[in-house]
Structures are given as structure tokens and as C-alpha cells.
């Protein structure tokens, strides 16, 4: 059977190597067949090092973060009210063309005995997004992490993203946006909590505060409020709200 021979992939390195990544970037630039005055210009002199740093420190640094550790140390609670953070900006890299995507994530869960700070949800999204990942897999990874590592009774993640795979190549549709949703546990079924989260997402996407982030704690949709998705210490959260108890958010 005819066809070109594909060289086997090298085994993955045990640890990231900035020098190896920089060398590979330099070889990639050589392989592009750029005009000599471009390839030898001062603009590209330090590009391999900068590219290696950008990838290892900003684009695929999520592989060094453990979702289980991020969600560890939750506060015990007997409550089952919806907890949500909307408008979480994130970026990821498409594994097909190694082009970035940039989007907004909305995350919610129904506690199964523990709650975590809003900031931990933001860090969870970053840890799972800063990888080579498709949007639909990212949404599922976030929801699954909340169920498996936090013990949430239900979890959901809704994403909207601009993918350069669609906007600068291929179909080249600059206004196209990718949407992905994942629902797990009790939120996989229609009910008050799921509908409340959908309302929060719709409000975030339609309102002037889009992308700024809003935290919500709601019992049957009776209470919600915009706030920064930063993580406050338990004592600070209790003082801020003026109420005691481990479930104060």
C-alpha cells in the first residue's frame, strides 16, 4: 500500500525543557522557508526563547496544576444551594492546529458536603484550560473535577470561545464563536438549580458586566449578587457578610 512514511513520535519528555522548546522553535522557523532578511532579523533573534517561555509559563502550564489540590480544603456545609461564578475569562490551545482560543467560562455546582472559595473555581478553570484541549472537553473536565474532587452533587460548565482555528484559518469567520456545555449529577436534569444557573449565564452574556465575573449563592434563585471571583479566607467571608457559619460565602 503506497503513501508516505510517517516518522514515529519521540517519547514524551519526563519534564518540560525550555531549552529544548527553544531549539525546536528555532528549527520550526528555519523550516518555514522565510526570506533570509526576515529569518536573520533582530526581531527573530530572541524569538525561540520567548516562544518557549510563553508556552511553558502561560499556555500549557496547566499540566503542572492538580485539580484535586486546587479543590482541596473545602469548608463543610449542609447546604445544597447553587454556587456559581460567571464571566471567567480564560485561554486555551487547540490540539489540532496549536492555535489559541479565548473565551468566557461559567461554572456552577450544588454542594455535596463541602464548598470552596470562588477563587478556587477560577483557578480550576485556568488549570484545565491552560492545556492542549478542545472546548467541549474543557467543559466536561471542569464539571467532572467538581464532582470527583469536591464531591459536588451536581456541576456544570458553560463556555463561549473565539477559536483562531475558525477565525484566521479554515472557514475564516471572524464572528464565529464556539459554545460548549457540560452538565453532571443533579444539574444534568432540568430543575430549579439548573434553570437558575442558565438565567445567570444569560444575564452575564447579555449585560454590560460581561466577562467581569459574578459570584452567586442562591436558594431557588432567591439570592444572587455580583462580586469579584476572588477567594476570601473563611473568617473574612463571615465578617464581610456579618453572619456566622461555615457556609457563608
Predicted regions and their residues:
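A domain-level signal for the structural core that forms small-molecule/cofactor-binding pockets
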Residues: 2-213, 217, 223, 227-249
Amino acid at each position: 500500500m503506497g503513501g508516505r512514511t510517517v516518522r514515529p513520535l519521540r517519547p514524551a519528555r519526563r519534564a518540560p525543557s525550555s531549552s529544548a522548546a527553544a531549539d525546536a522553535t528555532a528549527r520550526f522557523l528555519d523550516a518555514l522557508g522565510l526570506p533570509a532578511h526576515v529569518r536573520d532579523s533582530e526581531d527573530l533573534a530572541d524569538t525561540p526563547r520567548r516562544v518557549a517561555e510563553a508556552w511553558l509559563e502561560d499556555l500549557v502550564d496547566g499540566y503542572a496544576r492538580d485539580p484535586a489540590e486546587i479543590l482541596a480544603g473545602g469548608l463543610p456545609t449542609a447546604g445544597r444551594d447553587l454556587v456559581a461564578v460567571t464571566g471567567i475569562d480564560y485561554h486555551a490551545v487547540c490540539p489540532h492546529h496549536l492555535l489559541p482560543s479565548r473565551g468566557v467560562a461559567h461554572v456552577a455546582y450544588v454542594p455535596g458536603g463541602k464548598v470552596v472559595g470562588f477563587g478556587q473555581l477560577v483557578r480550576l478553570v485556568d488549570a484545565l484550560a491552560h492545556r492542549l484541549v478542545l472546548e467541549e472537553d474543557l467543559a466536561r473536565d471542569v464539571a467532572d473535577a467538581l464532582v470527583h474532587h469536591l464531591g459536588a452533587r451536581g456541576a456544570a460548565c458553560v463556555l463561549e470561545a473565539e477559536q483562531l482555528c475558525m477565525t484566521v484559518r479554515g472557514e475564516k469567520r471572524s464572528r464565529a464563536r464556539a459554545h460548549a456545555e457540560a452538565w453532571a449529577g443533579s444539574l444534568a436534569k432540568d430543575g430549579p438549580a439548573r434553570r437558575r444557573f442558565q438565567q445567570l449565564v444569560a444575564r452575564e452574556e447579555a449585560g454590560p458586566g460581561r466577562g467581569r465575573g459574578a459570584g452567586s449563592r442562591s436558594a431557588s434563585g432567591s439570592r444572587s449578587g455580583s462580586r469579584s471571583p476572588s477567594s476570601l479566607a473563611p473568617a473574612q467571608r463571615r465578617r464581610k457578610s456579618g453572619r456566622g457559619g461555615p457556609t457563608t460565602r
